[in-house]
């Protein structure tokens, strides 16, 4: 009887140990002061981690996931772009709303080759859009992709990639399409897509392989649609319209596939200690210096 009693007690102790080990991860986080917003936001974080991160670092993300700070960069930049569009489309009515007329070329925000000395235009052009389809496409992509990226990587890193794409877009346009104006946030949006695209390719088997092909097809479809509109704006716009450059799309994508990929692949690492980051920055700065030299001494717009 004593032996049976001891065996029963050992069985109870083992069960208690198992229960302790199987304590929900959310409860552990609550004990540490984390995850207080469970269960709704925890579910969102879990979904985001599956789409944005490879398997090895998802647990790390979930252990420290929170909404502080919230994804303010993408939200604020989207609101600013929408406000500028409303200003030019409603408060300063154009002849047509779907494709805004030449009024946007008079904006102090638009990148214009003949006003390149106003250096802010190399960044501020992202706030001006050429029509409803243009702004809806950019806002949709940067919200759907940018907010989850910012939840994972936070605003500083996402902002770095986004603005690197914007600046790369205007500088590339000044070289490869030097006589055309430039509007739209496509450089920044394509930088986010480029960084995410490279992460999906490199970590294809670890980022939900079943959905990997679907995600790639969605990205390709969006890029094809947006590039089609950009080419229309550049080459087939009506005579009374305002042709704009499309070089920002390509340059933004390359910025994303270099700087963006490095930034987004360093979720659980110190970015400044990653040699890939400095290689990407060095290449970016070299291209920037060449673009500045070209604009000062070689540009046909001089």
From Swiss-Prot:
Proteolytic processing of the proenzyme produces an N- and a C-terminal fragment. The processing is required for activation of the protease. It catalyses: Cleaves type-1 transmembrane domains using a catalytic dyad composed of serine and histidine that are contributed by different transmembrane domains. One of its GO terms (cellular component) is plasma membrane. The active site is at 186 (nucleophile), 249. Residues 16-38 have a biased composition (Basic and acidic residues). Disulfide bonds: none annotated. Residues 1-38 are annotated as: Disordered. InterPro entries: Peptidase_S54_rhomboid_dom, Peptidase_S54_rhomboid_met, Rhomboid-like_sf, Rhomboid_IM_Serine_Proteases. The chain crosses the membrane at residues 71-91, 127-147, 158-178, 182-202, 211-231, 244-264, 277-297. It is an enzyme of class 3 (hydrolase). GO terms for molecular function: serine-type endopeptidase activity. Its EC number is 3.4.21.105. GO terms for biological process: proteolysis. Keywords: Cell membrane, Hydrolase, Membrane, Protease, Serine protease, Transmembrane, Transmembrane helix. It comes from the Eukaryota. Belongs to the peptidase S54 family. Involved in regulated intramembrane proteolysis and the subsequent release of functional polypeptides from their membrane anchors. Known substrate: EFNB3. This is Rhomboid-related protein 2. It comes from Mus musculus (Mouse).
């Amino acid at each position: 009887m004593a032996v049976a009693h001891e065996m029963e007690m050992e069985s109870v102790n083992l069960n208690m140990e198992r229960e302790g080990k199987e304590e929900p991860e959310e409860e552990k986080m609550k004990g540490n002061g984390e995850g207080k917003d469970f269960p709704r936001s925890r579910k969102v974080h879990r979904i985001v981690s599956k789409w944005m991160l490879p398997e090895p670092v998802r647990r790390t993300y979930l252990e420290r996931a929170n909404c502080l700070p919230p994804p303010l960069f993408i939200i604020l930049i989207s609101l600013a772009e929408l406000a500028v569009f409303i200003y030019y489309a409603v408060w300063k009515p154009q002849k047509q709303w779907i494709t805004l007329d030449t009024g946007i070329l008079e904006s102090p925000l638009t990148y214009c080759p003949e006003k390149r000395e106003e250096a802010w235009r190399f960044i501020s052009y992202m706030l001006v859009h050429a029509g409803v389809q243009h702004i809806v496409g950019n806002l949709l992509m940067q919200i759907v992709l940018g907010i989850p990226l910012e939840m994972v990587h936070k605003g500083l890193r996402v902002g770095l990639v986004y603005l690197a794409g914007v600046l790369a877009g205007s500088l590339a346009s000044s070289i490869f399409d030097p006589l055309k104006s430039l509007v739209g946030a496509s450089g920044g949006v394509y930088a986010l897509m480029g960084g995410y695209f490279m992460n999906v390719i490199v970590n294809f088997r670890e980022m939900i392989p079943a959905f990997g092909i679907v995600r790639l097809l969605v990205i390709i479809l969006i890029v094809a649609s947006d590039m089609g509109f950009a080419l229309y704006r550049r080459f087939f716009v009506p005579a009374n319209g305002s042709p704009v450059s499309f070089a920002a799309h390509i340059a933004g994508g390359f910025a994303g596939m270099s700087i963006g990929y490095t930034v987004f692949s360093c979720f659980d690492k110190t970015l400044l200690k990653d040699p890939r980051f400095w290689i990407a920055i060095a290449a970016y700065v070299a291209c920037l210096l060449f673009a500045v030299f070209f604009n000062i001494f070689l540009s046909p717009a001089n």
